[in-house]
C-alpha cells in the first residue's frame, strides 16, 4: 500500500508544478478571437514587410519627419515580443511605451488602440503569443532627423494629445452605432489616414464627439495618397460591399486601401461591416466634402471633347480600353471614372499617384483575380495633365484642371521607374490635331476605333479594327500601324500578287470583319489610308520597324487542347465570355470582342490561324495582367499561348467563300483553317 500512495503523491506534486504552465496557455477560442481582433486592427499590413514573414516587421513607413520601420510582433523572445507580459503589451498598445520605457512614434496608432476593450486586448495578446509563428528578425532603427529623433519629446506629445480612456458606448445610440463607432475609432484606426493632422502630427480629432469632431474622418493626404473623407459615406449597403470586395457601384479602392481590404475588412463579419457602414453614414458631411452620389452612373454619350482635344485623344488612346469612352469602366474588372470620388477630389494626389505608378485591385474572396493598371510615367508631364484634366471635367465630374507642374511635383516625390526597354516609339493620338489634314486623320483613327459603329454596312460582325490592332494601332507587337504604309504596294503571298494598302484594308473588312469592302476612293477609305500615312514618319520600304506585327511563336510547339480549354477559362473567359461570345454591357454595347461564333472573325482571317493567334496572345493577352505599358498586356508562356490559341481558333466561326483563291502560288501555312 505504501508504493501506490507514494506514486499518488508524486503525481499530485507534478500536477501542482505544471499548473502555472497550463494557466498561461490560452484556450483555442480566445486565440481565435484574437486572430479576428488582429484582422479588425489590420496588424499584418503594417507589421509585414514586402515578401517578409508575417508580423515580423520591417515595413518602411514614410512620415513628414522621417522614415520609420514597423517592429517585429511575433513571439520571438530575442527580437519580438516573446518576453512581454500582458501588462507591458497593454501599456505599449494604449500609451505607446515599450517595456524598456522607450516611447514609440505615433505612426503606430496607439491613440486609437487605447479605446480597445480589455477583452479584445487580452485576446489579441493571446493570439500574437500563441497563434503567430516566432520569427527571429531584429528591428530596424528609425531614420529621423533632429529634433524628431529625441524620443523623450514623445512623452510631451502624449501629455498633450493622448487620451488613454477606453471606448465608452453612447447611451443615446443603439448597439449597432456603438459597435461601429468602437471599431472605426479604435481597432480599425480609420482616423490614422482619414483624419487631418495638426502641426504636431496629431489627429485633429479622435472621434466625432471630440471638441473638434467636425475634423474626424474628413480626409487627409498620406504617403502621396488622398485618403478621402469617410463622413456621410454612401448607403450602408454600398459601403459594406466596398469593404467586403474592394469595389462597389461608385468606386474601386486603390493604394494602401487595397491592402486594408485584402488583409483586414474582407474578413469582418457582416454584422461588423454593417455597424461600421452605419456609423460612417451617421456622420454629417464635412464642409469641403463633395456630395456622395446616390445613383450609379449610367452610360452616357461621349464628351464632345473626346476627339477634338489633346486630353480627349490621349484618353481614348491610353485609357478608354479599360475605362471606356463614357468613363463607365467595366463592371467587376476596371473602375468607372464617372462619378468616382478619387477622380474629382479637390486634392488629386491619388489620381496623380495611380497615373504615374499604376494600380492593382484588391484581392478578395469575391474578386480573387487581381487586375493591374501599369504606370504611365513614360508620358510627359503635359500629356498626363491634359488627360487627367479631361477626365476630371467629363461625365459630370467637376474637378479642377491638373497642371504640368502638379504632375512634375508628384513625379519628383515618387520617382517612378519605367523598365520597358523597347525601341518602339508610341505615336501620340493627341498629335493628330497638329496635322495639316487633322480632320481627315482623326476620322481615319476613329474608323479604326469605332469601325462597327461608323461603318455598319461594311462590318458583318461585332469587331472593330482595334480588336486586333490595339489602341488604334499604336501598341508594340499589337499589330501597330507605325511605318506600315511604307511597305505598300507590296507582295502578299496569300493573294499571290502585289496589293495596295487599300486592298489590304479591304481584306480585313472581308475576313476579320466578315463584311464588305469599302470603295478604294471613298472618303472613309482615304481617311483610313491617311491615318496609316500619318504613322509612316520617315520609314522606308527597306527598313525594319521595331514592334511591327505580333511577333512569332515556334510552330514546333504542339498544342494541348485540353490545357487550352483550361487556360481559356482561367485567363480569357472573363473578357471574352464562357462561350467565346465576348463581353457586352447592359445596354448591348460591345466591350471586348467575341472569339468565336457568328459575331467573330471568319476562317479566312489571320487570327483564325493557331500560331498567328498564339503570337498575338503571347504578347498582348490578357490585359491588366502586370505592369507592361500601356495595357498590362501579355504574360502567358509560349505553350499556354499555343494551347489557348489552338482551342479558340478551332471553335465554330463563319466561313470565307473565297478561301479557295488563297495562296494560289502555294506556301499555305500549316495552321490555315482550310
Locate predicted features.
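Primarily the internal scaffold of c-type cytochrome electron-transfer domains
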Residues: 62-68, 143-165, 170-171, 181, ...
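Short, solvent-exposed loop/turn and secondary-structure capping segments
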Residues: 48-49, 54-59, 102-104, 135-142, ...
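Sequence context of c-type cytochrome heme-c attachment sites
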Residues: 32-33, 40, 48, 53-80, ...
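Axial heme c-ligation environment in periplasmic c-type cytochrome domains
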Residues: 61, 67-83, 88, 94-119, ...
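Conserved hydrophobic/aromatic "anchor" residues
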Residues: 38, 84, 89, 127, ...
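Boundary of Sec targeting at the N-terminus
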Residues: 24-25, 35, 371
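Sequence/structural segment immediately N-terminal to covalent heme-attachment motifs in c-type
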Residues: 28-49, 53-62, 156-159, 168-198, ...
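Post-cleavage N-terminal segment of exported redox proteins
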Residues: 1-30, 68-71, 92-100, 119-174, ...
